[in-house]
Design a protein with these regions (language model features):
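Bacterial Sec-dependent N-terminal signal peptides
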Residues: 1-19, 331, 395
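Phosphate/pyrophosphate-recognition segments in soluble nucleotide-handling domains
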Residues: 2, 323-335
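Hydrophobic alpha-helical membrane-insertion segments
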Residues: 11, 221-223, 310, 354, ...
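Generic detector of isolated residues embedded in canonical secondary-structure elements
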Residues: 17, 141, 209-210, 299, ...
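N-terminal catalytic or cofactor-binding beta/alpha core of small enzyme domains
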Residues: 19-296, 302-327
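C-terminal outer-membrane/trafficking sorting elements
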Residues: 332-343, 347-408
Length: 408
């Protein structure tokens, strides 16, 4: 018995995107990272409340695959939605890149969404792409190779702004001794598109888990990896420990500290991280560290040579994440013309599935949520009705005993 997953449309067409591009998404994002403003220049500025509200609407529309609406709303923000086809992956994959227009001065970061994610609950974040060497490039490598749901990367160096965040915590990162975080440090500022997008996906993707990649200079007393869920609390699903175990499978020489396991460890544990505070339901995301963990935020500090230096290290992290976060919707590669047909496609209401001995049909939306299920007694060519479903793209999962499968 095999499962067959088809992609089909319910009567929807999209007008042209703001931009269409293709190639290798790693190269596309690496070029972006290489050219973002550095540790001075004061290029970064917080969005205002109106811009934050508009941005939230853009994210709502992207998650609902309403790309025309997303493009229309985002235009006023100096951003665009680029439909990017990665031709280095077989089969090719489409990503939607929410990015700054060349003419814009809004350096709020770049946000990448998989059109057809394999791991719908996995969100990757890299807020320090310039200071924490290679974490941005590691993040896009892991995103592409896991086909995670989304990737967030910052828009400037963390020290770019001359203004300080009002949020609690201090750092010596930007010189002049210990001082408050800069506004351009997106891991320590709540008035950002980075924070707003985190809030949206945390709220709207119920099982989403946010992996935030960082880097540090290792002291002799430090391990190679420091992980934290943002609290001292051990969650029901302990992703930090799971990732540790899978990383050890990749490289047994790695050493670790995990903040909720060794409660005396205090260095680089991310308790002032505003995304972690939000995800862990702190009473004040800006100024109060969370006391309990939802288990959905993992802060990973990495020594450079073992994990961040090049694609050899990135592969270790990517493989570990693949192992921990299993596919949320298994899609095998088939020659669909020889397997089955779906008509009409797009459809207004009813759809005919031309296949033999079908005993179950499941339908999923782009969030990986099951919106329809029906069982049969090994029927041929079943008809299902979708008149009650919203417009959009859906995944059709067929289960049957005599469906012809052709693997590429």
């Amino acid at each position: 018995m095999k499962n067959l997953v088809l992609i089909f449309l319910i009567f929807v067409t999209f007008s042209s995107f703001s931009q269409i591009s293709s190639g290798n998404i790693e190269n596309y994002i690496a070029n972006y990272i290489d050219n973002v403003p550095g540790n001075s220049g004061n290029d970064y500025a917080d969005p205002n409340n109106s811009q934050l509200a508009t941005w939230n609407t853009v994210i709502d529309n992207l998650l609902a695959n309403n790309l025309t609406n997303a493009r229309n709303f985002v235009n006023s923000l100096g951003y665009q939605v680029t439909e990017f086809t990665d031709t280095s992956i077989s089969p090719n994959q489409i990503f939607y890149i929410l990015e700054k227009k060349t003419s814009s001065s809004n350096y709020w970061g770049t946000y990448v969404f998989s059109k057809t994610p394999t791991r719908n609950n996995l969100i990757l974040q890299a807020p320090h792409i310039k200071y924490d060497t290679n974490t941005g490039k590691q993040a896009i490598f892991c995103f592409k190779n896991t086909l995670a749901r989304a990737l967030f990367i910052s828009g400037t160096h963390r020290c770019n702004s001359s203004s300080f965040s009002s949020c609690s915590g201090t750092t010596s990162t930007c010189g002049s001794g210990s001082q408050s975080y800069k506004k351009s440090d997106l891991a320590h500022n709540v008035t950002t598109m980075f924070q707003k997008t985190t809030e949206n996906l945390f709220t709207n993707i119920s099982n989403s888990v946010f992996i935030q990649l960082h880097g540090f200079g290792k002291k002799s007393s430090d391990p190679y990896v420091i992980m934290s869920n943002g609290t001292r609390d051990t969650p029901a699903t302990d992703y930090a420990s799971l990732i540790k175990n899978k990383l050890l499978n990749e490289d047994s020489s790695l050493t670790f500290q995990i903040a909720h396991i060794n409660k005396s460890w205090t260095r680089l544990i991310g308790f002032t991280n505003t995304q972690g505070r939000l995800i862990n339901n702190s009473s004040n995301h800006c100024n109060t560290s969370a006391s309990s963990s939802t288990g959905r935020f993992i802060h990973i500090e990495q020594e450079k040579l073992k994990l961040r230096n090049d694609s050899n290290g990135w592969t270790k992290m990517s493989n570990a994440l693949k192992s921990v976060f299993q596919s949320t919707l298994s899609i095998e590669k088939y020659n669909l013309n020889e397997v089955v047909s779906v008509s009409p496609n797009p459809t207004f209401d009813k759809v005919l599935i031309s296949a033999k001995d079908v005993f179950q049909i499941e339908v999923y939306n782009l969030l990986g949520q099951k919106v329809f299920q029906k069982k049969f007694n090994k029927v041929n060519n079943p008809i299902i009705n979708f008149i009650s479903q919203s417009k959009g793209i859906y995944f059709l999962n067929l289960r049957g005993n005599s469906i012809k499968l052709v693997k590429n």
